[in-house]
């Protein structure tokens, strides 16, 4: 049973903590917060996690709020086999020095630059690259979504190049200080966006260019993907491959799943914790091969698709499972992923 510390108990961190707790080969030894808010309280009182603080000077604030703390982040990582770092992107470099000093392995999130660790991770496409290493980085939610489907398609279609338009949600549902609320914003207003180069960190040699924009919604991202392929394949072959791939769902707009709102409702119907949709939904009707070009549309639940990737990254770094598909299957079973 490996010991996992979660540094940063926010949107991703709290989900990773619950995912770790659901496994039978690892356990949560602590989570961290910097402020005594409702997440801090529920972590301790509802989830039963030991809570450590990232800013020791705020210990009195937690005491005044009546939230029990177990120590500092430095204390927490001493007991860990690996730290899953879910802190804001600007904190990563200084945390890395702390982890190195403590001699503990660490997994970062996609908000950090690839250069921080020199390794990026996706369970399907490059699990082996991080096996036994000290530090890696799970790529962002959008990059995870692109990589899952492209790495499934490539073996049968032989991808020549990819062009994708990323329609990004303006903010997460709980964020009240971000937007836009009445605008479409090129983000960034140049090509390429960072998503294409990020895909290249986990799919070596792929020719991919992306452009992105923000829209006034909070539910999910949506991708419009155009792929030039070398092999002659039928549309149904692409559909079959995507249907066989776990963590990808081929969904039918004709059955009432024609929007991101309906996909989120579907997650509720599945009884998912926090209404999470870990899988990447691809609209069946959008999948089309025309000559040497493949087109499809997909959605990404930005709060949760990277969560199972973090579990597999733990197994890779700690050499708990050498076969990526076995780790994926184990994670999926514990989390109820299709």
Curated annotation (Swiss-Prot):
Give the reaction(s) catalysed.
Answer: D-glyceraldehyde 3-phosphate + phosphate + NADP(+) = (2R)-3-phospho-glyceroyl phosphate + NADPH + H(+); D-glyceraldehyde 3-phosphate + phosphate + NAD(+) = (2R)-3-phospho-glyceroyl phosphate + NADH + H(+)
Which SUPFAM superfamilies does the entry mention?
A: Glyceraldehyde-3-phosphate dehydrogenase-like, C-terminal domain (SSF55347), NAD(P)-binding Rossmann-fold domains (SSF51735)
Q: InterPro entries given for it?
A: DapB_N (IPR000846), GlycerAld/Erythrose_P_DH (IPR020831), GlycerAld_3-P_DH_AS (IPR020830), GlycerAld_3-P_DH_cat (IPR020829), GlycerAld_3-P_DH_NAD(P)-bd (IPR020828), Glyceraldehyde-3-P_DH_2_arc (IPR006436), NAD(P)-bd_dom_sf (IPR036291)
Which superkingdom is the protein from?
A: Archaea
Where do the annotations place D-glyceraldehyde 3-phosphate binding? Answer: 140-142, 195-196
Q: Per the UniProt record, which EC number(s) apply here?
A: 1.2.1.59
Task: Please describe the quaternary structure of this protein.
Answer: Homotetramer.
What's the protein name? Glyceraldehyde-3-phosphate dehydrogenase
- Source gene? gap
